[in-house]
């Protein structure tokens, strides 16, 4: 796939690494173009662009910014008509220990309102950056899960195919409204990692008997 990654922080860097390793064509952008250039230089199939040029002919946009910056970052890309936007954000408080919105809406639903011409899908939000960068295999050869929620079948299929290309199991989590559940799940994972001291090599998964 041809994929634009928006954000050069820990999650954006982890995506650039894994997408490049899987053979995807990656276009990287962020608030500081120099950071994007440094990141892109580390990987094959990766290039850096200012926001206005970052979309190019990408099929998919991975939104790897803070939630507060999400709408502005997406709108800076230009025309998103028909594009699949994978929202990995969580609406976290400053101390990362709570969510700023929830129950009656979600980060994904608010982002979808901001870019109604795009197909928004929630995915990857329950993974720490370290886990994403290290890949889907855990202890005892267990594979981690990526939960995928969207009102668009195409967006859901695209995010599912992308996650599977990186080696992850996927769970169909229904419509975008279920981001209201996935974001608190990420919040619990963050608490367990930092608040309960379990570290950042953990992730929620879904088991079948």
Annotate each language-model stretch with its function.
Residues 14, 18, 114, 162:
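Rossmann-fold NAD(P)-dependent oxidoreductase module
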Residues 40-43, 51-95:
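Rossmann-like NAD(P)-binding element
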Residues 48, 119-123, 171-173:
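General beta-strand structural signal in soluble alpha/beta enzymes
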Residues 89-137:
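Rossmann-fold NAD(P)-binding glycine/threonine-rich loop
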Residues 23, 57-59, 118:
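Short, well-ordered alpha-helix to beta-strand connector turns
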Residues 1-38, 42:
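NAD(P)+-binding Rossmann beta1-loop-alpha1 motif at the extreme N-terminus of oxidoreductases
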Residues 6, 141-209:
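Active-site-lining helix/loop region of Rossmann-like oxidoreductase modules
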């Amino acid at each position: 796939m041809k994929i634009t990654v928006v954000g050069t922080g820990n999650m954006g860097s982890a995506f650039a690494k894994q997408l490049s390793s899987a053979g995807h064509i990656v276009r990287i952008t962020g608030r500081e173009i120099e950071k994007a250039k440094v990141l892109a230089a580390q990987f094959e199939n990766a290039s850096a662009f200012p926001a206005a040029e970052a979309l190019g002919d990408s099929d998919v946009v991975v939104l790897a910014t803070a939630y507060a910056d999400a709408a502005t970052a997406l709108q800076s890309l230009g025309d998103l008509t028909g594009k699949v936007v994978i929202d990995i954000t969580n609406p976290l408080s400053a101390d990362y220990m709570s969510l700023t919105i929830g129950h009656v809406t979600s980060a994904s639903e608010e982002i979808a309102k901001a870019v109604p011409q795009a197909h928004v899908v929630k995915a990857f939000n329950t993974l720490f950056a370290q886990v994403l960068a290290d890949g889907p295999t855990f202890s005892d050869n267990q594979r981690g899960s990526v939960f995928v929620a969207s009102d668009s079948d195409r967006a859901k299929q695209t995010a599912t195919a992308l996650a599977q290309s990186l080696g992850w199991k996927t769970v169909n989590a229904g419509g975008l409204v279920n981001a209201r559940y996935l974001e608190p799940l990420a919040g619990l994972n963050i608490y367990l990692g930092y608040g309960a001291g379990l570290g950042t090599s953990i992730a929620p998964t879904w088991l079948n008997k």
